[in-house]
A protein has these predicted regions:
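Noncatalytic, solvent-exposed loop/strand surfaces
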Residues: 1-307
């Protein structure tokens, strides 16, 4: 499901029916529109789940499905459209459906919004929507998978872009400052690529120079972010994983659907610090704010802290 975002004054919420709503922090509605009314009916196989991302005063939506391939920028103050661009792709069948979320990043003078789906990871100019670069061959034509819909989202950290694909296929890591044009395997700016081993649903985690890929079955693949060298692979809990891992204070937290929370020490070697369990089911990713951990279960919302 889509995750809310906030600038500290307003909270922005997106629903599976396409409602995009802004509230003030007291819960008063400021503006609203429906993305299906504005941009056409959704045609997703499994519903609309993409988060609307807030970046430098604007909201960015990716609407990637069988009836539309759009990226949209909206003014966060008014809800009015700033720009809309068509996101070109040659993907077919189920690949046309993206359940991933865009991400946005500023690195010095470089600002970028990254959309993900329909076989490509694409960087856009936030001011205009113009395509700056695209990571290609995530679903190679010589062994094309017509069901390779993207669910895991790209991440940006320490100047690296991590672009996952799906279903244990490939992942690409690109240096953001060098990204340019069409980036195939070994292309401009690409640091490394592996042809298999990506996550399917959970998003990658890049933390302190190490890339963590949490598989759906509770296996973590740990790689050197600069070189792609495998550091370790361990199955730490045999359960279903939907929520993405998070990092804090030198630790990595993994959330299993059965309510088991596994804590690993961050670093290049495997070290299990502990496990805890709550009597609930979890498919959402944890959120961390002001020394508190927030967990959204099927039954309850939990806040966990030292006080």
């Amino acid at each position: 499901s889509a995750t809310p975002s906030s600038d500290g004054e307003k909270v922005f919420v997106t629903t599976g029916t396409g409602e995009v709503v802004a509230f003030d922090v007291s819960g008063n509605e400021k503006w609203r529109f429906n993305a299906q009314d504005r941009y056409g009916k959704f045609r997703f196989g499994f519903g609309f789940h993409s988060t609307t991302v807030l970046h430098e005063g604007r909201l960015f939506l990716q609407l990637i499905h069988s009836a539309a391939q759009l990226v949209v920028s909206v003014d966060s103050t008014t809800g009015k459209e700033v720009w809309k661009v068509e996101r070109k792709s040659d993907g077919v069948a189920e690949c046309e459906h993206s359940y991933a979320s865009p991400t946005a990043h500023r690195q010095g003078d470089l600002s970028v919004v990254i959309t993900h789906g329909n076989d490509y990871c694409i960087g856009h100019d936030p001011a205009t929507g113009k395509e700056l670069w695209r990571i290609a061959d995530l679903n190679p034509k010589d062994r094309y998978n017509r069901t390779l819909r993207f669910v895991a989202s790209p991440v940006v950290s320490n100047g690296f872009v991590v672009a996952p694909s799906a279903k244990n296929r490939g992942v690409s890591v690109v240096r953001l400052a060098e990204a340019k044009g069409r980036i195939g395997k070994g292309g401009v700016g690409e640091l490394w690529r592996m042809d298999k081993g990506t996550t399917d649903v959970t998003s990658p985690l890049l933390y302190e120079g190490v890339l963590y890929l949490c598989k759906e079955n509770g296996t973590v693949l740990c790689l050197d972010a600069k070189t792609g060298e495998q550091l370790y692979q361990e199955r730490f809990h045999g359960q279903t994983y939907r929520g993405s891992p998070v990092a804090f204070n030198g630790r990595i937290l993994f959330t299993a659907r059965d309510g088991t929370f596994t804590l690993l020490k961050a670093g290049k070697s495997y070290e299990l610090l502990g496990k805890n369990k709550l009597d609930d089911e979890f498919t959402a990713s944890p959120a961390i704010s002001r020394d508190r951990l927030y967990l959204r279960g099927y039954k309850y919302l939990y806040a966990i802290g030292t006080k």
